[in-house]
Amino acid sequence: MDRTLKFVLATLTSNIAFAIYHLLLGLYTSSWWLLTLASYYFVLSIVRYVVLRYKSKEDFIIRFTGWMLILLSVPLVGTVILSVLRDRGHELHMIVMIAMAAYAFTKITFAIIKLIKARRSKSAILVTLRNISLADASVSIFALQRSMLVSFEGMRETEIVIMNAALGSAVCVIAFLLGANLLRNKKYSLTN
C-alpha cells in the first residue's frame, strides 16, 4: 500500500470518528452546531470513501468531489448562521485549547503544503484528495476560532459574532471554490 493510500485511510478513519464524536456530543448537549458538524464530517467521509473506492474512474471522482465540496458549503453556511444567531461556541480548558490549536494548525499547514505540491501533479486523484484536505482543515480552523474566542477573555460579544461570521463565510467560500475548481479544471490526466 503506498503512502498516499495509507494517509487517505487514516484521514477517512479520523473523519468517521469525528462525525460520530460530534453526533453523540451534539445529541447529548442538544447543540445544533455539533450536529451540523457531524453531518459535514459524515459527508466528507463518504467523499473520501468514494475517492478510494472508484480511484480508477478519475473523471467520475473529479466531478463527484467537485459537486460534493460545493454541496458541503451548505451545512457550513448552517454552522456560520448558528454561530452568529445561537451558539457562539463552548468554553474549553486552556490545555484542551492548546491541543486543538496544535492539531488545527498542523492540519492546515500540511493541507496547504500538500495542495501546493499536488498542483504540479497531473494526477486527478492526488489533486482531488488535496482539495478535500484543505476544505477539512479550513473547518478545523473555524472550529478552533469559535472555541478560542469564548475560552479566552478579551473580546466582546459583538466582536465574537463578527469574527465567527467573517471566518465562517471565508471557509464556506473556500469549500465552494475548491469544488468549482475541480469541476472546471480539465488539465488532469485520466490515469493515475
Q: Regions from the language model: what does each represent?
A:
Residues 36-72:
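Hydrophobic/aromatic-rich structural module bridging two neighboring secondary-structure elements via a short loop
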Residues 23-35, 80-95, 148-160:
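Helix-coil boundary and interhelical linker segments in multi-pass alpha-helical membrane proteins
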Residues 138-192:
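C-terminal transmembrane-bundle signature of multipass membrane proteins
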Residues 104-121, 141-148, 176-180:
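Alpha-helical transmembrane segments in multipass membrane proteins, preferentially the mid-helix core
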Residues 1-51:
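N-terminal topogenic module of multi-pass integral membrane proteins
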Residues 38-45, 72-76, 94-113, 168-173:
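Generic alpha-helical transmembrane segments
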Residues 7-12, 63-74, 129-140:
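Select subsegments of transmembrane alpha-helices in polytopic membrane proteins
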Residues 96, 114-139, 187-191:
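Membrane-helix boundary/juxtamembrane motif in polytopic membrane proteins
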